[in-house]
Amino acid sequence: EDATDSAVKAVVITVPAYFGVEQKEATKKAAQLAGFTEVTLLEEPTAAAVYYGYKGDKNETVLVYDLGGGTFDIVAVDIDGFKYDCFAVEGDYQLGGKDWDTEMVKIIKEKLEEQDCDCCGLSPEDEAEVRRAAEDLKIKLTARESAQANLRLEVGKAKIEVTRQEFEDRTRPLLDKTIELTKKVAEDASAKGKTITKILLVGGSSYMPQVQQRLTEEFPNIEVPNPMDPNKAVSKGAA
């Protein structure tokens, strides 16, 4: 209301595709208690499909691959004009970009040990510095084959380099988990007579090149478009 300088009584809220009736009703009730009189719930994969251009003029079935910071889910969405049916859902709600960060932290500490830096007793401040560097390196490696980080630790300064290949090799088991769940949803869709045409990438962690590359390898007959601002795909689709 501060942004629009007017009262806001209608709201669109996105919810995970795995939400049941009770969870949806609880969400709607919470919005009503907050003062909203018109509450529309939109499943997140539907919002993502709308953002990718599915706005009433297409009839096909797509997969929405959503790899966020803390969770992963894969959903099959059947699109018939303005009708969106999320009919198959799988996910790992303990898996997300934070796990890739954790593996990068391990890589950094190994490289620090090679420089005779004892990582067993790092202070909380140094641990935070290592995690900051890990997140920064992960982002840099989306566009580069290698990246460097300068760390300012209590035990001294350090400079390390990590290659994309090194990072992808280390995190392959994490990506494998998402691929297995994606295969399961694709098989469920096929069993229902549906043909998957595209895999839409959602969630900031889907920026990592290994995601699109691996999906393209595993599903050669399905188009995997370049991610379109995956961090905001759901919110922009809802808007």
Outline where the language-model segments fall.
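Oxyanion-binding/catalytic loops of NTP- or PPi-dependent enzymes
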Residues: 2-239
